[in-house]
Amino acid sequence: IWDSTISINLTAQWHLIRAMEPLLIAAPAGRAVLVSSGVAERIAPFWGPYAISKAGLEAMGRVWAGETEQTNLRINMISPGGTATGMRASAFPGEDPDSLPQPDDIAPAFLTLLSPNCQDHGKRFKARSMLGL
């Protein structure tokens, strides 16, 4: 579990960032939103690899934001919060998915951070808080 989780949630993100950075910097309003999780900032027993990968992703995002401070690129992190997804259903099989927002419900938070009007940089946001959910 460790290797696959770190590979997907951290290593692949690093390679994607390095590959896309020139295009994002060249764009008049390049935006990158890294998807984190609440487990990145709290103790989550039995969630070690996932929590560590998301905490690492947030650190990588903050470092990348510092490296691109003098460009038009804006980088932020977002934690969607509990959302009715297949991954969530697998992790919490007893949870009622109807009690959670749907992905479409939280999408506007992502769009806000991807907007050319967004000037935030190197910050972490909670999607549900942004939307009052």
Model region roles, listed by residue range:
Residues 17-18, 62:
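A short, exposed helix-loop element centered on a Lys and neighboring polar residues
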Residues 1-7:
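Active-site Tyr-X3-Lys motif and surrounding loop/helix of classical short-chain dehydrogenase/reductase
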Residues 70-73, 77-78, 85, 94-133:
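C-terminal helical subdomain
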Residues 1, 25, 31-56, 61-70, ...:
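Catalytic loop of short-chain dehydrogenase/reductase
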Residues 19-23:
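A structural motif corresponding to the C-terminal end of an alpha-helix
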